[in-house]
Regions:
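C-terminal helix-cap and adjacent tail motif
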Residues: 6-10, 14, 88-89, 161-189
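Glycine/small-residue-rich phosphate/adenosyl-binding loop
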Residues: 44-116
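A glycine-rich helix N-cap at a beta->alpha junction
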Residues: 68-77, 152-177
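Structural motif
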Residues: 99-101, 135, 160-162
């Protein structure tokens, strides 16, 4: 079994997966572990939608790309210029054709929602890595607005997607990228 430090050092963002189904039971175990993440005032505001249908994942990708490009054209969001051409490519799937997609969702009325969901998302990614699975938080995949798609995902009014996470069996685990030393601004003793 991996130590916690080994887990921290070995987790990677994975965007290339084996064409292998991820059992729902494993995803449910991972989500159960994610509920152990801390949240403000122990509010536990995170909810989850699981998508393991490739056609639906592709449709969600297309919806997100369309909304992102529309927002970009209307100056509602900034994008790295390199992303614009990629998003216009009909064959590009923002979810990288992953076998499974987890949306971390919560109520917009919760003041700490983004922080709480980010903590749950990190627990998802570490739980998956401990099982030899790969994950990646796909920020470009959060732009789902179509009411039918939101209904399909079970997202009620007043809730939003915070963290779309792809998950599956990695084709390979890339080498670690260089990490900077922590920038400690000050120590007050």
């Amino acid at each position: 079994m991996m130590t916690f430090t080994e887990l921290l050092k070995n987790r990677r963002a994975i965007r290339d997966f084996q064409d292998k189904e991820l059992p729902l039971k494993i995803v449910e175990e991972i989500l159960q572990e994610s509920t152990l993440a801390p949240s403000a005032s122990n509010g536990q505001p995170c909810r989850f939608s699981i998508v393991n249908c490739k056609d639906t994942i592709k449709a969600l990708s297309d919806e997100s790309k369309e909304n992102l490009l529309d927002d970009y054209a209307k100056n509602k969001t900034s994008l790295n210029p390199g992303y614009v051409d990629v998003l216009k490519d009909k064959n590009f799937n923002v979810f990288y054709n992953a076998p499974c997609l987890i949306f971390v969702i919560g109520s917009t009325a919760v003041h700490s929602l983004e922080l709480d969901c980010a903590l749950a998302a990190s627990y998802i990614m570490f739980s998956a890595a401990s099982r030899g699975l790969g994950t990646c938080w796909i920020a470009l995949g959060a732009y789902i607005r179509d009411p039918q798609m939101k209904a399909l995902l079970g997202i009620p009014d007043g809730c939003e997607i915070v963290a779309p996470i792809i998950i599956g069996y990695p084709k390979e685990i890339p080498a670690a990228s260089e990490r900077h030393a922590p920038q400690i601004l000050r120590v007050i003793s």
